[in-house]
UniProtKB/Swiss-Prot annotation:
Record organism: Parainfluenza virus 5 (strain W3)
Region Fusion peptide: start-end pairs: 103-127
InterPro entries assigned: Fusion_F0_Paramyxovir
Disulfide bond annotation, renumbered to this chain: C64-C185, C324-C333, C348-C356, C380-C385, C387-C410
Designated gene of the protein: F
GO biological process: fusion of virus membrane with host plasma membrane; symbiont entry into host cell; viral budding from plasma membrane
SUPFAM superfamilies assigned to the protein according to its UniProt record, in alphabetical order: Head and neck region of the ectodomain of NDV fusion glycoprotein, Virus ectodomain
Protein name according to UniProt: Fusion glycoprotein F0
Length: 529
């Protein structure tokens, strides 16, 4: 029953995925995981957003001196004044005067920017192009300043120039204003000051990089999220004509922002948002494939299949998406990154397992399990699979390539030295027997390391033999050295003894000579007497 449920779930995920056979693939350790749509994008349109850095606050008590507002304005002015000066400098350098040709003005302006990358130069030129719109928006600052709406349209005559945003106005309208109605001046000051201080901290984080050069430092997606606050979904819906949610757009990283105007008197900032043009490729799905080792024909093997495929009808192609942006639901690409697969690989993906190619694996540094949607797919013949709650060892028969484990059979699972808590579908083992031809198992780097391990083992054995021979030679050399030293000592002692004998012989001979001479002299003396 668990197997049927699992197959139904995967089949629903892959609805419209053509001839890809998830049930057959899971039998050999290939698990289809994420299924996404494919979209192509290019930068095309832009929108302007004016951000009111100071919310509209109507004090119900006349005569109150709200010092927190003055302090906030002074701090924000110090923080953003370098940005305003930088914007003015770049604008003056890049916008030609009447006496100066446009081309010459741009060249001189870019030279004034110093060393810059192509992206930075593009950002600077974009600043010039947006200057007219930013100026038109800031000319309506009085109308913008009077509104206390969190999001409002900026309209000149019948032309919509952009969207006015007050990131903290929602909080002011719903929380602060009702609270200060019954409060005194000090309480009002404290409440308003706390809100403004929090927003000031966020502004400091957002514009840290822009203080150096706003034209060359685009605003990040995280900064846009903080800057627009709770108004973000509304701003995206009003400014951009797209069916994609604000969360999806932000997670894609395709939205970029750039400061193009600033008015510190009214605390208003104009931001240009670049939005890509998106096109969906119909009837196409990008499917991720997670591959684990499987126990087939009494050996551990791994299927040789791509990690990501594109399925269009009955056509299956590899899709690395190396130059694409991937979100949980969509793959955004500038171009089609598909690669043609061999006939055998396509047949394998379609469920013909006799056409699949496998590689034998040796060692522990490989993938033997994968977790997806609260389910564990594991090769329990090649690793320890132990259920901790309830306590039991999970056995995988030789006829089963992989084992599927879920919470109905095991809540707490141990895989070798790792422990998991499973939260979701039934512990089931595929009972189908898969027979592979010898030609299906190929040695493919880097998965097949058996030959390399054999070579390493042989090298180790040879090294041990050489070490043993070295010990023998060393022992022989040591013995020979000891014998040589003793021989030298014996020769030296023998030589010294011989020299002593010679010296003693000479001395004795001299003494005998003297004695004989004295005796002869005494005999001659007696005879003459």
């Amino acid at each position: 029953m668990g197997t049927i449920i699992q197959f139904l779930v995967v089949s629903c995920l892959l609805a419209g995925a053509g001839s890809l056979d998830p049930a057959a693939l899971m039998q050999i350790g290939v698990i289809p995981t994420n299924v996404r749509q494919l979209m192509y994008y290019t930068e095309a349109s832009s929108a302007f957003i004016v951000v009111k850095l100071m919310p509209t606050i109507d004090s119900p008590i006349s005569g109150c001196n709200i010092t927190s507002i003055s302090s906030y304005n002074a701090t924000v002015t110090k923080l953003l004044q370098p940005i305003g000066e930088n914007l003015e400098t770049i604008r003056n350098q890049l916008i030609p005067t009447r006496r100066r040709r446009r081309f010459a003005g741009v060249v001189i302006g870019l030279a004034a920017l110093g060393v810059a990358t192509a992206a930075q130069v593009t950002a600077a030129v974009a600043l010039v192009k947006a200057n007219e719109n930013a100026a038109a928006i800031l000319n309506l600052k009085n109308a913008i300043q009077k509104t206390n709406a969190a999001v409002a349209d900026v309209v000149q005559a019948t032309q919509s120039l952009g969207t006015a945003v007050q990131a903290v106005q929602d909080h002011i309208n719903s929380v602060v204003s009702p609270a200060i109605t019954a409060a005194n001046c000090k309480a009002q000051d404290a409440i308003i000051g706390s809100i403004l201080n929090l927003y000031l901290t966020e502004l400091t984080t957002i514009f840290h990089n822009q203080i150096t050069n706003p034209a060359l430092s685009p605003i990040t997606i995280q900064a846009l999220r903080i800057l627009l606050g709770s108004t973000l979904p509304t701003v995206v819906e009003k400014s951009f004509n797209t069916q994609i949610s604000a969360a999806e757009l932000l997670s894609s990283g395709l939205l970029t922002g750039q400061i193009v105007g600033l008015d510190l008197t009214y605390m208003q900032m104009v931001i240009k948002i670049e939005l890509p043009t998106l096109t969906v490729q119909p009837a196409t799905q990008i499917i991720d494939l997670a591959t684990i080792s499987a126990f087939i024909n009494n050996q551990e093997v791994m299927a040789q299949l791509p990690t990501r495929v594109m399925v269009t009808g009955s056509l299956i192609q590899a899709y690395p998406a190396s130059q694409c942006t991937i979100t949980p639901n969509t793959v955004y690409c500038r171009y089609n990154d598909a690669q043609v697969l061999s006939d055998d690989t396509m047949a394998c993906l379609q469920g013909n397992l006799t056409r699949c190619t496998f590689s034998p694996v040796v060692g522990s540094f490989l993938t033997r399990f994968v977790l997806f949607d609260g389910i564990v797919y594991a090769n329990c013949r090649s690793m320890l699979c132990k259920c901790m709650q309830p306590a039991a060892v999970i056995l995988q028969p030789s006829s089963s390539p992989v084992t599927v484990i879920d919470m109905y059979k095991c809540v707490s699972l141990q895989l070798d030295n790792l422990r998991f808590t499973i939260t979701q579908l039934a512990n089931v083992t595929y009972n189908s027997t898969i027979k592979l031809e010898s030609s299906q198992i190929l040695s493919i780097d880097p998965l097949d390391i058996s030959q390399n391990l054999a070579a390493v083992n042989k090298s180790l054995s040879d090294a041990l033999q050489h070490l043993a021979q070295s010990d023998t030679y060393l022992s022989a050399i040591t013995s020979a050295t000891t014998t040589s030293v003793l021989s030298i000592i014996a020769i030296c002692l023998g030589s010294l003894g011989l020299i002593l004998i010679i010296l003693l012989s000479v001395v004795v001979w001299k003494l005998l000579t003297i004695v004989v001479a004295n005796r002869n002299r005494m005999e001659n003396f007696v005879y003459h007497k």
